[in-house]
Regions:
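Alpha/propeptide regions of enzymes that mature by internal proteolysis
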Residues: 2-4, 10-13, 17, 28-300
Length: 300
């Protein structure tokens, strides 16, 4: 049995968000008309954990009568601006060439419009850039150099996104001289083997950690961040932030932004900038986003 994105969101919404959104229930996926959804009694914002500190900014937009997508942007640009959040925006972990490349997408429920960018360098707020693609072009997605040029033309400043902390973490990864990279078969391949440095290979773990601790000290990684940096080398993170909003009118919007999989090959795009993979909003049903291994999510 195959499910459409609408069916998937409808089933998920009914199963896990009925209380928050005051849904009039359907226990099965829609087979024709969209399920009936009442507007919530109060506006609702959902976000990945790294957006929690910025929820008040989103609610401030909604309480002032602002648009749901503007509220989403207020939440997710917070982590993009934070140099200590290495999953998105400024300070995001770089690719294998030590270059930060960012992806984002957004969807506006009331107008059913969408915008997306992928592989963007030197522009911090790619969530806003995706929104600008939606509002000022006849396209849905721009990528790489074209997306960057469009951003500069539209007034986005050119910024160095690589912080010293992220650069040193990359250096720690590079200097381990290991096979912990993204060449070769992926997770879904029967030929895939976990690298020798994976956490579940205990016979190598303690010795490897000690060597990496010494190397981290030599590189200049702060002692309090040392183990976090080592963990990022051994288990490259795929951090993302998604945010979805619904107001009292039942209007919805959603967006996802990320610096992608750490140490990825240059030019790699995961699920985050892909409409229907990293984020999807259906005004008649609901809004959802994803985080984790983008390659696997795209195939679902």
């Amino acid at each position: 049995m195959r499910f459409s994105r609408r069916d998937f969101i409808a089933t998920t919404a009914i199963g896990s968000a009925s209380l928050a959104l005051d849904l009039q229930g359907q226990s099965k996926p829609a087979t024709g008309a969209a399920p009936s959804v009442n507007p919530p009694k109060k506006a609702v914002i959902i976000s990945a954990a790294n957006g929690y500190n910025y929820l008040d900014r989103g609610y401030a937009v909604l309480s002032g009568g602002g648009d749901t997508l503007d509220a989403v942007m207020q939440v997710i640009t917070g982590p993009e601006d934070d140099p200590n959040d290495d999953s998105v925006g400024l300070g995001g972990l770089p690719n294998e060439d030590c270059v930060v490349e960012l992806d984002a997408c957004c969807m506006h429920g009331p107008t059913r419009m969408a915008g997306s960018v992928a592989g963007v360098r030197d522009i911090k707020n790619v969530s806003l850039l995706a929104k600008t693609v939606m509002e000022h072009t006849g396209h849905v997605m721009l990528v790489g150099e074209g997306a960057q040029k469009f951003g500069f033309v539209m007034g986005f400043p050119k910024e160095n996104l690589l912080t010293e902390r992220s650069r040193k973490t990359w250096q720690l990864w590079r200097e381990t001289m290991s096979n912990d990279d993204w060449w070769g078969p992926g997770l879904a391949s029967p030929k895939f083997k976990f690298p020798d440095t994976a956490f579940n290979v205990s016979e190598y773990y303690d010795e490897r950690i000690k060597r990496m601790e010494k190397l981290a000290e030599t590189i200049g990684i702060e002692p309090e961040f040392c183990m976090a940096a080592i963990e990022r080398v051994l288990n490259p993170p795929s951090g993302t932030i998604h945010c979805s909003v619904v107001n009292e009118k039942g209007e919805m919007s959603g967006a996802t932004t990320t610096s992608g999989l750490a140490w990825k090959l240059a030019g790699r795009a995961g699920d985050s900038p892909i409409i229907g993979a990293g984020s999807y909003t259906d005004q008649d049903v609901g809004s959802a986003g994803a985080t984790g291994n983008g390659e696997e999510n795209i195939k679902v």
